């Protein structure tokens, strides 16, 4: 408050009446005397005012004038007794819209709105329509809100922003009451001084910077949700990050390095930093408003009015009002600076409402759009510019580091091109964890394989984690490995491309004709490791693999076959190797005498599968005494069976008996529940034993893997305790028989024939059994041919041409009936 100027209030000596009228006209003005002022009387007495007072000259009327504080602290209430009667006020005070009353009311209203927004964000999510549930995909900044797929779920950025705004306005309200109380004690009302003292508080400056940051981030996330194209999402994200960073820097400098009453209005800027801070705030607000209005115009069919949701017009009005607040107050700052004494509080809560209400508006628009398009074509919008986000095939197969040594510690880089190296996806945390586990287990298993042990463990671990790698043998000597490595260097690019296709292939070109399932890139370039399961009918749809190098031994090929690690697969390898040694005793076509060319990793063809079924039936009926299903001499067959099953009689009987009991074409015969339970228990026991041995040998020092397995086990136990598995054993069971399959009569005929042969009757010759030489059940020559260098074509599958006609089946049935009748007839004397 400005001090009073020294002037003469009371004349020193009375003069004439003319002089008195002149001085009265000059001094006829009421004067406000502030507190702690001193009045000096003519006799030298000094009077100190303990409270504000008013001096009334002699010309003043009897009525008491009103005391109104002006900008300088003094206000004159001049009264001319000749012209007017009554109190008169000067125009030196602030207008009402710039006084303390509108400021206090605006602050109270914005505080209530801020807390209302917080309550809206924390209430229970709800859905607007039954079929209008919006699913936003995975969590993340560029993928929407909380990611739960329920309308009403809010992102945490909006919650934090609304909460910080409510806290900031609460602090501003408390400071405003303190300053207003001080002014009331002095009898003053200064709105600008009140606002400057409140906004220049240190606590409010800090919380305001934090609140503004979260507000801009929440608005950026809302904009990202509006546009579905990934390119637009990325552009919005990085543009918003840049503008928010600059705004944060300049706002901090403006608050702490350039404090002052003239740094908040455009017309009173004296430095560049306050102007830049105001410019970035205005740019963020205007850009957000422009993009939201553009989105509403694109969705004008649902945005402003819809018959299924008539209150959407109210939400649209609130959204437009909240996003236009920065533009409106920018115009007011330029035109009427005094009017916006309380505009900062409105901008504050308007930014929070612009994010929350617009999010609600967008959810309603998407709900209406999904409800209307629910019966349309299923799928996802694909844009032309999204190819830029696809991963290149070269980037997904990074070369192994030179510091990483090979399985035998030689440290060479032979596997860097993709033939034997480890391959994981770039940027995938799960892939990196799996690769670390695979590295430890692969190194330990390779050390064991160098000593000629754990073939099953080695190939099971590799087949379960990687593609097929034919150069990682189990029982190959060092010389053979060097030769193989030297040979592979000559054909490295083609072999690498053939054996290691990219995990994420590029988008195929649009095809004008239907896609051929046999003429695809996957069938020509992918090598699959197939695990044989007795309950599935495996058909080979892969093309011919190239013949392996001649350095590969028989033990290596047998090790490649063993990919499942079960006793059944081990016995399968032995049964494959056994007939090769007895080919000289049985006649076969010239094609059958050829050496088995490709390894048995991928080849489980149709003839081989049928041969396995037939051999399993023969082994089951004869309890391991017969090896070749098409042997002509029973004595020779028994001799061969004794030689082949001498070392593994018990394992073969158990494995093949289990396989025969679980074959799918034996569904026509009645099987008891005990047999099924026994087979399942045998298989589970063998798998559990193999798993225990594998974990005990390869993962002994893999502490991280063991800790993760322990955590998973404990989590499963806790989940079972919280939500136990429902008891389904007591529920009624209805057995629905399967429909008759094509070839069921043939299978039944074969089973009856095998049962008669197992009961001790002489076995008919192959020329008397036309059915057994059919393509459905291959003979020994066909079985050898299926493993030879001429495999079946990828276009071959089960069709009607491979199934014998009903006439042949009936003829075979009559022939078998006549033979059985002849055999049962007593011999003639």
From Swiss-Prot:
This protein's UniProt keywords: Cell membrane, Membrane, Transmembrane, Transmembrane helix
Q: Which residues cross the membrane?
A: 35-55, 104-124, 160-180, 234-254, 273-293, 312-332, 339-359
- Where it mainly occurs, coarsely classed, is membrane
One Pfam annotation, family name?
Answer: PalH
Q: Which InterPro entries match?
A: PalH
Top-level lineage group: Eukaryota
Per UniProt, the ranges with Pro residues bias are: 502-512
Residue intervals on the Cytoplasmic side: 56-103, 181-233, 294-311, 360-829
User: Where located?
Assistant: Cell membrane
- Residue ranges, Periplasmic side: 1-34, 125-159, 255-272, 333-338
Q: What membrane topology does this protein have? A: Multi-pass membrane protein
Whether Protease counts among this entry's keywords is: no
> GO CC annotations?
plasma membrane
Biological processes, Gene Ontology terms: cellular response to pH
- Has the keyword Transmembrane been applied to this entry? yes
Q: Where is this region: Disordered?
A: 1-23, 389-522, 537-702, 714-829
Residue spans of biased composition, Low complexity class:
634-653
Biased composition (Polar residues) is annotated at: 776-796
Composition-biased stretches (Basic and acidic residues): 604-615, 692-702, 716-726
Its biological purpose = Required for the proteolytic cleavage of the transcription factor RIM101 in response to alkaline ambient pH.
**Family statement:** Belongs to the palH/RIM21 family.
Q: Can you name this protein? A: pH-response regulator protein palH/RIM21
Organism this protein belongs to: Pyricularia oryzae (strain 70-15 / ATCC MYA-4617 / FGSC 8958) (Rice blast fungus)
Q: What is the lineage of its organism?
A: Eukaryota, Fungi, Dikarya, Ascomycota, Pezizomycotina
